[in-house]
From Swiss-Prot:
It comes from the Viruses. Keywords: ANK repeat, Repeat. SMART domains: ANK. The keyword Hydrolase does not apply. InterPro entries: Ankyrin_rpt, Ankyrin_rpt-contain_sf. Gene3D superfamilies: Ankyrin repeat-containing domain. The keyword DNA repair does not apply. This is Putative ankyrin repeat protein L59. It comes from Acanthamoeba polyphaga mimivirus (APMV). ANK repeats lie at residues 41-67, 68-97, 98-127, 129-157, 158-187, 188-217, 219-247, 248-277, 279-307.
C-alpha cells in the first residue's frame, strides 16, 4: 500500500459521509490485504531467523506477528537452538504439538539438554512409535539411543527401523549395540546388509554376514548394488564369500560400466563376467553417460578379441 493511500483513508475517516462509504470499504479491504501480506512476510522472516539461530531477529518477528505458527518450535529444535525454543515456549507455543516432532529433532541432533527440557515440558518420549529413538539411530547417536532406551523406548519398533537405518547410514558401533539389544539384523529381507553394501559400508557388511545375514537376499542385490555404486572392496568381499557376479545377465558389470566404475569393471571382467552381455549394454551405456575411460577399456578388450 502506498503512503498516499494511508492519507486517503485518514481523510475519508475524518470527513466521513455516506457518499464515501464505498471508498472507505475499498481502503479497509486494502488494509486487510496488506496485513495478510505482512503476516506472510514475517512468517518467512521467522523461518530465516530460526535457520540462522538468530534470537534477536526471532524476538523482533514474534513481536510483530499476531499469531506465531507452532511449527516454529519444531524448527527451533531442527536447527538445534534451545535458547530460541525456550523463548518460543514462553511466548505460548506448545512443545508437544505437531506429533512431538521437536523432541524427535532434538534426539536426532544428539541434544540431551533439549530432549530433557522437552520431556520436562510434557513431551512424550515414545510418541509416534518411538520416533525419537528411530531418528537418533538414523543419525548414529549411540548415547542418545541408550538414553532413550532407559526411558522406555523400544529399539525394535517399526520393524527394526533403528538397526536397518543405522546400517544403511554406516553407524557401525550403533549396529553392534542394537544387535546386542535384540534387534533383528535380518528383518525385511536382510535390509541392513543390502543397504550397507549399497552405501559402501564394508565393515558393517562383514559384521552382518558374520552374524548370519544372507548375502544372496533379494536376488543377490548386495553385490549388484555394490557394483553399481563402485565399491570395489565390497564387491571383492561378497564375491569371495559366494555372491554370484554373473547374476541377472551380468548385472554387476553392466551397471558398474554404466556408472563409470572402471576398477569394478576390470575386476569383474577378470573374474569371468561377460562385458558384452545384453547386446553390449556396458559399452552402450558407458558411452551414453560419458565414461570415456570405461569405453576405452571395453574397446581395447574388443580389439584384442578378449570378448
Amino acid at each position: 500500500m502506498e503512503l498516499s493511500q494511508y492519507h486517503q483513508i485518514l481523510s475519508l475517516l475524518n470527513n466521513f459521509s455516506n457518499k464515501d462509504k464505498i471508498s472507505v470499504i475499498e481502503c479497509l479491504d486494502s488494509i486487510s490485504e496488506l496485513r495478510k501480506q505482512m503476516s506472510v512476510l514475517f512468517n518467512k522472516l521467522l523461518k530465516v531467523a530460526l535457520k540462522n539461530r538468530n534470537l534477536p531477529m526471532v524476538k523482533f518477528v514474534c513481536d510483530n506477528l499476531e499469531k506465531i505458527d507452532n511449527k516454529a518450535i519444531t524448527l527451533a529444535a531442527k536447527y538445534n537452538c534451545l535458547e530460541i525454543l525456550k523463548y518460543l515456549h514462553e511466548k505460548g507455543l506448545d512443545t508437544t504439538n505437531h506429533n512431538y516432532s521437536a523432541l524427535s529433532w532434538a534426539a536426532r541432533n544428539n541434544d540431551f539438554k533439549m530432549v530433557e527440557y522437552l520431556q520436562h515440558q510434557g513431551s512424550d518420549i515414545r510418541a509416534n512409535d518411538d520416533e525419537a529413538l528411530r531418528w537418533a539411530a538414523l543419525s548414529g547417536c549411540l548415547e542418545m539411543v541408550e538414553y532413550l532406551q532407559t526411558q522406555g523406548c523400544d529399539v525394535r519398533n517399526r520393524n527394526d527401523f533403528a538397526i536397518k537405518y543405522a546400517a544403511r547410514n554406516g553407524h557401525f558401533k550403533l549396529v553392534r549395540y542394537l544387535h546386542s539389544q535384540g534387534s533383528d539384523i535380518r528383518t525385511d529381507d536382510d535390509y541392513a546388509l543390502r543397504w550397507a553394501a549399497r552405501n559402501g559400508h564394508l565393515e558393517i557388511v562383514k559384521y552382518l554376514h558374520s552374524k548370519g545375514c544372507n548375502i544372496h537376499a533379494y536376488g543377490d542385490s548386495a553385490i549388484k548394488w555394490a557394483s553399481m555404486g563402485g565399491y570395489l572392496e565390497i564387491v571383492e568381499y561378497l564375491h569371495g564369500v559366494g555372491c554370484d557376479i554373473r547374476i541377472d545377465n551380468d548385472y554387476p558389470i553392466r551397471w558398474a560400466a554404466s556408472n563409470g566404475h572402471l576398477e569394478v569393471v576390470e575386476y569383474l571382467f577378470s573374474q569371468g563376467c561377460d562385458i558384452g552381455a545384453d547386446n553390449n549394454y556396458a559399452l552402450m551405456w558407458a558411452k551414453k553417460n560419458g565414461h570415456d575411460d570405461v569405453v576405452e577399456y571395453i574397446v581395447l578388450l574388443k580389439l584384442l578379441k578378449l570378448y
